[in-house]
Amino acid sequence: GKGVFVIMLDICLLGTGGMMPLPYRWLTSMMARYNGQSILIDCGEGTQIAMKEKGWSPKPIDVICFTHFHADHISGLPGMLLTMGNAERTQPLLLVGPKGLSRVVSALRVIAPELPFEINCMELTESEQTISMNGFRIEAFKVNHNVPCYGYCIVVDRIGKFQVDRALELAIDKRYWSILQRGESVSTEKGNFTPEMVLGEPRKGLRVVYCTDTRPTESIVQHAGNADLFICEGMYGEPEKQAKARENKH
């Protein structure tokens, strides 16, 4: 029968609490794993403990994205950086967040001044920005909180189906088929071949949207409307708390 194509994207909600931790709920943090890489979105107090409880590791984290700079979303960062350093991490770490990220990180690093790896800060200045990773991308989009705040969308694209008849017509040696199928070009004695020559139309991939601390916005509708998984806050879920939600921009 036909093979089934599966995109393995693991999502773990490490913390879902707001303002203060509870015995059963740490402060805000979400981790995603794909293709040997990990993304952390927010790093509230208790993130490391939750990671240990779930059996996840901070070692493969390539990027940490911050929605905004309230303490319950970022106060776990210094300890996380120190743990990475103690684990002898040497590869650079990318931090992504609203304007002012470098200043906030510098202040938090007063208690984590010496690290064996480089930290690169990417400050978001547009209403929408894309960060390209290895095999997937992160889309940041502005939302509406009482400080600059962004939602994030993790997108795993799926390339088109390999067209055997096209490959045969072009007389491409079969040993190169798997390379082209991965989306990589090849240079052979018969010439150069690109994936576009042998792949069909792109197929539906996977889209995960994470959004917290915001009023309802059109940007959320645009990015989450066709999401496979939409993770959203519910800080003031009860009807009697609607006025409080509007006041605090939740």
Which residue ranges define each predicted feature?
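Binuclear metal-ion centers of metallo-dependent hydrolases, dominated by the metallo-beta-lactamase
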Residues: S127-E128, P216-H250
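A gly/proline- and charged-residue-enriched helix-loop-helix capping module
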Residues: R103-V110, C121-E126
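Active-site metal-binding motif and surrounding structural segment of the metallo-beta-lactamase
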Residues: E45-V96, E118-T125
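Active-site neighborhood of phospho(di)ester-bond hydrolases with catalytic His/Asp-centered motifs
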Residues: I41-G44, I61-F69, G97-P98, V208-T214, ...
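Short, Lys/Arg-enriched N-terminal segments with co-localized hydrophobic residues
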Residues: G1-I7
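Active-site-proximal loop/helix segment associated with metal-binding centers of metalloenzymes
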Residues: L22, F136-Y210, T214-H223, L229-I231
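Conserved beta-strand hairpin/beta-sheet module of binuclear metal-dependent hydrolase folds
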Residues: I7-K54, P92, Y152-I154, G200-C211, ...
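P-loop/Walker A phosphate-binding loop and immediately adjacent motor/lid segment at beta-alpha junctions
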Residues: M80-L94, M197, P202, Q242-H250
